[in-house]
């Protein structure tokens, strides 16, 4: 299931010790006051919860940053008999990881945001074969395309109509990492991955 992908990434991120909480799959939501914020869907009863609690001992969230693409991999079509073919697909999820880690818990360095980013990039690009196996996929690969450590730029990309509270944000290493997760498998795998999940 696609849930396995996000739970696995979340577990690996929590393993760094930077975060108390990782929200696995967030969306930018328009609130009743007209502002836009990243929020996590908890349940029908609880609704959406705010993920930008800078009072926490480190927090992180993952959100989609565009449309998921699904392509048929014609070169990977396999014939097992004259009448039986397996159609392979590649689903690419464009994602963004946003983290806030208290600087008081980090090395005292002007490069602290970049140091955090480098470690998290290593986590995101680590081996995902166990996740692929759990999803019944051929492979799962996460590849980072870039990162940002400018607090103002990150805040403005994640929020609309919400003022940046400099007294809070600048006490944290505030990092955004863009990455793609590519899942390869047969069509049945994709159907199973997305069924009744995110």
Which stretches of residues belong to each language-model region?
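Beta-strand elements of well-folded, non-transmembrane domains
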Residues: 76-78, 95-103, 179-187
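Short N-terminal helix-initiation segments at or just after the protein's N-terminus
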Residues: 19-43, 114-122, 174-188
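Extracellular/virion structural assembly segments
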Residues: 84-92, 98-131
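A short hydrophobic beta-strand element
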Residues: 62-73, 95, 171-181
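Small/polar-rich, solvent-exposed N-terminal microdomains that initiate assembly or binding
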Residues: 1-83, 136, 198
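Polar/charged alpha-helical tracts
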Residues: 11, 20, 32-35, 46, ...
């Amino acid at each position: 299931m696609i849930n396995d992908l996000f739970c696995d990434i979340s577990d690996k991120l929590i393993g760094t010790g930077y975060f108390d909480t990782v929200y696995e799959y967030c969306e930018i939501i328009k609130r009743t006051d007209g502002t836009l914020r990243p929020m996590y869907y908890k349940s029908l009863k609880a609704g959406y919860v705010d993920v930008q609690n800078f009072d926490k001992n480190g927090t992180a969230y993952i959100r989609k940053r565009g449309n998921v693409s699904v392509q048929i991999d014609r070169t990977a079509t396999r014939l097992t008999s004259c009448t039986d073919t397996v159609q392979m697909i590649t689903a690419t999820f464009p994602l963004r990881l946003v983290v806030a880690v208290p600087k008081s818990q980090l090395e005292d360095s002007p490069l602290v945001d970049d140091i955090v980013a480098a470690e998290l990039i290593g986590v995101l690009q680590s081996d995902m074969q166990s996740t692929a196996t759990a999803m019944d996929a051929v492979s799962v690969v996460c590849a980072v395309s870039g990162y940002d450590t400018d607090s103002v730029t990150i805040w403005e990309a994640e929020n609309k109509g919400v003022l940046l509270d400099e007294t809070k944000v600048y006490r944290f290493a505030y990092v955004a990492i863009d990455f793609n997760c590519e899942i390869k498998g047969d069509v049945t795998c994709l159907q199973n991955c997305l069924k009744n999940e995110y």
